UniProtKB/Swiss-Prot annotation:
One of its GO terms (biological process) is proteolysis involved in protein catabolic process. It comes from Haemophilus influenzae (strain ATCC 51907 / DSM 11121 / KW20 / Rd). This is ATP-dependent Clp protease ATP-binding subunit ClpX. The gene is clpX. Disulfide bonds: none annotated. GO terms for molecular function: ATP binding; ATP hydrolysis activity; ATP-dependent protein folding chaperone; protein dimerization activity; unfolded protein binding; zinc ion binding.
Amino acid sequence: MTDKDKDLHCSFCGKEKGEVDRLIAGTDGYICNECIELCHSMLEESHDKNLEESAVENEEKLPTPHEIRAHLDDYVIGQDYAKKVLSVAVYNHYKRLRTNYESNDVELGKSNILLIGPTGSGKTLLAQTLARRLNVPFAMADATTLTEAGYVGEDVENVLQKLLQNCEYDTEKAEKGIIYIDEIDKISRKSEGASITRDVSGEGVQQALLKLIEGTIASIPPQGGRKHPQQEMVKLDTSKILFICGGAFAGLDKIIDKRTQTSTSIGFNAKVEKDEKQQSLSELFRQVEPDDLMKFGLIPEFIGRLPMIAPLSELDEDALIQILTKPKNALIKQYQALFGLEKVELDFTPEALKAMAKKALERKTGARGLRSIVEAVLLDTMYDLPSLENLQKVIVDESTIVDNLAPKLEY
C-alpha cells in the first residue's frame, strides 16, 4: 500500500482505503462501501416507517357501524335489523384486522355472517354493497356448484381462486376481502342421522368449507384448475377473510314455529290451539336458534363458524315500489338515464309502479324479478327508440303493465 493510499480514507467512518472493499470519491471527500450500505438500510427503515404511518392513517378511516348502515341505506331498502347486524359484524371484523389485536387472555374470534331470508330480499346486494363501501375485494360463489375435493364439480377452494383473480393475485389484498356464498341452505345434509353413502354436495361440502371459514393457510393454484405436485401454489390465510353465507332456508320457518308455538292440550282428544296471530316469516327468522338450523340440515360445527345471524324480511308492495325508485342505483333511475342518452324523458305513473310491484309479488321473485318486468315492458320501445325522431317523452302507466299495452309516446 502506497503512502498516497494511506491518506485516502472514508470521510464518514474514517476507515482507510485498505480497510474497506471500495472507496468512492466525491467533490470534497470519500465514502466507503460499508457506509453506503448503512445509509441504504437507514433509508429503507425510514421508508418502511413512512409506509406504516400511512397505513395507520388509512386504518383510521374505517367507517363506524352508523356510517356503514347509512351507506347500506343508500342502496338497500328496508331490512333494518339485518343492516344493523351486518354493520356491527363488519366493523368488529376489520377493527380486529387493522389493530392486529393480540392478548394472552382474550382471543377475538371471526364475525362470519349468516343471512337468512326469502329469494329477492337483498342478501347478495347487501354483501356487494358492504365490499364496495369498504373498498375490499369481493367474490361470490354458489354453494350448489361446490363439491368435496376429488369429485366432479367445483372444489371449495375455487372460491378463494375467484377472490385472488379479482385482486390480481395480490394476497395481502385478498386476505382483507369478503366472500359471499349463496344458496348455503342447499348444502344441508339430506337426513339428521349419519349417512351410509357419501354426501359430496351436502354435508361433505359443509365439512370442506369449515376450515376455510374458520381460518387456514390454503394452497391455491395460481392459474386455477386442479392441483398437481409440480405446480407452485399461492398461500392464502383465510382467517382474515370475512365470509358471508346466505340462503332462503325454505321450511326453516316451520321448524321455528313448531318449537315456539304455545299449545295446550287437556284430555285424550283435545285439539292443539295455536296463537291467533300468525307470525310473519321475518318474525320467525328473528327467533332462529342453532338447534333449528341443525334440524334443517346444517352440521353443528358449520353453524358455530357463523356466529352472526342476520334475518331478512319478506318485501311487501310498498318496499318493492321504493326499491324501484329510491336507491341511488334504482331501476327506474337506471332506465331514465338510459333513455336520457337518446334525449328522451321516461316517466312511470304511480299506478304503473304499484302494478309492477304486485306482479313481482305474484311471481314470488322479490326485488330480483323487478328488472325482468321493467325490461319486458320497455323492450319494444327501446328497440324503436333510436329510430323515433322528435320523440320527447315515454309514459308507462297501469295499462302498460296489466294489459300489456304499449307505453304512451309524446312528440
